[in-house]
From Swiss-Prot:
Subcellular location: Cytoplasm
Protein name from the UniProt record: Glycylpeptide N-tetradecanoyltransferase
Role played: Adds a myristoyl group to the N-terminal glycine residue of certain cellular proteins.
Entry GO MF terms: glycylpeptide N-tetradecanoyltransferase activity
Organism, as annotated: Cryptococcus neoformans var. neoformans serotype D (strain JEC21 / ATCC MYA-565)
Keyword Acyltransferase: yes
PANTHER family with a match to the protein in the record: GLYCYLPEPTIDE N-TETRADECANOYLTRANSFERASE, N-MYRISTOYL TRANSFERASE
Amino acid sequence: MDSSDSKAATDEEIRRALKAADLMKILDGKIALGNKSGTKNLGEHKFWKTQPVPQITGSGAPAPIEEGPIDDPKTPADVRQEPGVLPAGFEWSTIDINDEEQSKEVYVLLCENYVEDDDAMFRFNYSREFLLWALTAPGYLPDWHIGVRVQKTKKLVAFISGIKIDIRVRAKTFPAAEINFLCVHKKLRSKRLAPVLIKEVTRRVNLTNIWQAIYTAGVILPTPIGTCRYFHRNLNPPKLVDIGFSPLPRGSTIARLVQQYSVPSHPRIPGFREMKKEDVPQVGALLRRYLDRFDVAQAFRDDDEVEHWLLSGQGKEVGGRRVEQVVWAYVVEDPTTHRITDLISFYALPSTIMKHPKHNLLNAAYMFYYATDVVFPPSSSSANSDVDVDANAGESSVAAVGTGGEDAKTKKKLETRLNALTADILIIAKQAGFDVFNALTLLDNNMFLQEQKFGPGDGYLNYYLYNWNCAPIDGGHHSTTAKQGSKIGVVML
């Protein structure tokens, strides 16, 4: 090979590496809203200095504070009754996400503006089914799905959403809003609509006597309660190499990559099957108890929530990958007792691949909630006890010991079980046609990431609480090799 061929090969390697980095950033959440800075546009620090959030001190660390609400107690009567003022030429619009035309407007806005790389190579592809699943959880309020339209044309140019969620932070459980999908049209970023949208959704949430919120961002705002890192598991090496997601290592071949990332043809855990509606009470009890081990977690106060998040997005028809399916949930049923001993689930969020001659969609799966009873004493495990966890209890029904509170023997059992569960769910994802399986360092994911061949991404996801002082919570991103679980038990879409 002459020097020109060598240079061309080097240039090609650089091009593919840069392309892969762009896609990794998208999957990691580092590139968002299509802005050139590659950050999630949740408002400038100047705006957040006016909000009831812990402030970053001069040393870069949050000031020592007592956990609890930041603002003085208020009532809905103290809240402004009229919407905030928008720039001239724009108007507020409450979005009916169940209306096909309006949900399509949100879908188009998000797909074209929410997340893409600077070269418009990849975009998140939110389906209508995904948005319905994400935004219509039990108790949702249509008033919390807020849009901004151009007055003359009625074109939807901005959106923000909130859904009700019960959050437990250590020993305290309280109602909150989960804020998501803040999106402003790329051509209107100079209008500073993001802070206006945040203020408006805050106003509407406060009118329902809810004063706290949880949200995430790939950038540092005042002030994260914890940070998780993204990891990715290759399921389709030929395609990921072809689109530039994964470089082909020097001296390697596609065949070697296929062998390296191959999975068995069938799940191996006895009793591993798809979750059914009749499993909901047992799954709910198991999931609540498992999440009690974390410092921050969704409370899942009733089984309606469990059914919605794990079953309502299962799609239509049966067998294989269903039409309109967005969530996959599997359980392990003890063959002898017929008790549910384990749960594992994931959801689908594909990305459109722009300007590629062969591929137009990256099928990405994201680890969702899971639980197993191996962390509990045999006498009280869900598989060996008839004692039910009260689904409607106001406080955690099991003392929150925090992940990492188990002894070494129990931790080893947990590690072994989670690796087995993850190995089986990777098989399901592969059979369903997914190209990559993504996971954060939350929950107990660190116990299986390395063994199941997940590779680290370069993105981090920061968790935030609005109007709640909170000591830092370990997001697990420093301890993947130590297989130490994190203290974050909330999975946000």
